[in-house]
């Protein structure tokens, strides 16, 4: 109700949600309030439903992480640390902004639907 009132009066023009569950919850609230696609909406992480909402124009963009890269860099840093090498205090594992224009890009598709057999074997 508060969202609908603020959006109707021009008080809310854009939204950002910081994880998959809040992004999905906000999408449901916007759909229920008939505001989906009427406000700028950027979320974080992805699911099939959220990607469908990007494709449908109900979410403007999603920020995606690269779980494989996160794990790989973490293990590499730990191995380096155990071998006595210097390890940076922070490591940027990367993020990718996904919108309707680049959703079908092969690099984006690899993030949202990784070929697990490639890494885990048959």
What is the role of each PLM region?
Residues 1-122:
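A residue-level marker of the well-folded mature domains of exported/periplasmic proteins
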